[in-house]
Amino acid sequence: MIEPILLGMVLGFVPVTIAGLLVAAWLQYKQGNPSGLGEK
């Protein structure tokens, strides 16, 4: 059984991380620099 505290941290941290990445990518795209999206 997973510890409730660890489970709560993971469930709270993952959506925030995904949202942060999406916001960062959207802000960079909004600034007019879509050329760096397909370089990886």
From Swiss-Prot:
Protein name (Swiss-Prot/TrEMBL): Cytochrome b6-f complex subunit 5
One term of GO molecular function: electron transporter, transferring electrons within cytochrome b6/f complex of photosystem II activity
Subcellular location: Cell inner membrane
First and last residue of the signal peptide: none
Top-level taxon of origin: Bacteria
Family named by the database record: Belongs to the PetG family.
Matches recorded under NCBIfam families: PRK00665.1
